[in-house]
């Protein structure tokens, strides 16, 4: 049912500090990181770190109603927030997972790549 790993979402208190960590500690060149962009409809600011065969999405809260704030309250240094796999039909995949007992936290929505 699942396809290729598209990206791993990592909630962070500061995208710029996280980028510095990926650059200085892990050796990721600055050219492999995108500029930060705001997604106000989801209450997040995001940037991507491009690594071989995938991406890491850095997610910072945007505004005081950001769902990422709750995550960071429990995990102040940040951490893995989600894993994104590509599927042919998101609704079919969701329904199949629910039928097998999976908990689905919300409806599919347009993400940072502009896709469901």
Predicted feature residues:
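Core segments of cupin and vicinal oxygen chelate
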Residues: 2, 10-55, 93-102, 107-116
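Vicinal oxygen chelate
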Residues: 5-13, 47-50, 69-94
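Short, conserved turn/kink motifs that form compact alpha/beta structural patches or helix kinks used as
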Residues: 61-66
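Short amphipathic alpha-helical segments, especially helix-boundary/capping motifs
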Residues: 21-23, 67-71
